[in-house]
Swiss-Prot record:
The keyword Ribonucleoprotein belongs to this UniProt entry's keyword annotation: yes
Protein's recorded name: Large ribosomal subunit protein uL11
UniProt record similarity statement: Belongs to the universal ribosomal protein uL11 family.
Protein species of origin: Rickettsia peacockii (strain Rustic)
Record key words, sorted: Methylation, Ribonucleoprotein, Ribosomal protein, RNA-binding, rRNA-binding
InterPro entries tied to this protein: Ribosomal_uL11 (IPR000911), Ribosomal_uL11_bac-typ (IPR006519), Ribosomal_uL11_C (IPR020783), Ribosomal_uL11_C_sf (IPR036769), Ribosomal_uL11_CS (IPR020785), Ribosomal_uL11_N (IPR020784), Ribosomal_uL11_N_sf (IPR036796)
Oligomeric form and interacting partners: Part of the ribosomal stalk of the 50S ribosomal subunit. Interacts with L10 and the large rRNA to form the base of the stalk. L10 forms an elongated spine to which L12 dimers bind in a sequential fashion forming a multimeric L10(L12)X complex.
One GO term (biological process): translation
Cellular-component GO terms for this entry: cytosolic large ribosomal subunit
Pfam families: Ribosomal_L11, Ribosomal_L11_N
Cystines in this chain: none
């Protein structure tokens, strides 16, 4: 059984259960002659059980026959960090210059567990350090052990 020839990949961040033919989805898929309505329906069906509006990084694989498949990744670390810190946006200046909120080390560990499939490590401690680094670059202070 031969595999289909891949025409290209499209990387988008799409809100859960919120795929519409409007930009950026419509133009990105239209350029590659993909059935936009079919993608939107499939994506919305796949994300139906999730909280509406969560940003989901999605990799769409487009094949030569204009068919497609897609892989939904976990929401960005920044989404979880903002949720745990109860803030709407990160600091405009980075690191310790302007602290806009706090997260605990346990929060970072919990986020790391959720993000493990998409991080380039299998070690929970290394994943926690990655999340702590993201928190610091957003202007969040990590408290606790």
């Amino acid at each position: 059984m031969s595999q289909k020839a891949i025409k290209g990949y499209i990387n988008l961040i799409i809100p859960a259960a919120g795929a519409t033919p409007a930009p950026p989805i419509g133009p990105a898929l239209g350029q590659r002659k993909v059935n936009i309505a079919a993608f939107c329906k499939d994506f919305n069906d796949a994300t139906q059980g999730m909280e509406k509006g969560i940003p989901l990084p999605t990799v769409i694989t487009v094949y030569e026959d204009s068919s497609f498949s897609f892989k939904i990744k976990t929401p960005p670390a920044a989404y979880f960090l903002k949720k745990y810190a109860k803030i709407t946006k990160g600091s405009s200046s980075t690191k310790k210059e302007a602290v806009v909120g706090k997260v605990t080390m346990d929060d970072c560990r919990e986020i790391a567990k959720l993000k493990m499939p998409d991080l380039n490590t299998k070690n929970i401690e290394a994943a926690t350090k990655i999340i702590c680094g993201s928190a610091a670059s957003m202007g969040l202070e990590v408290v606790g052990n």
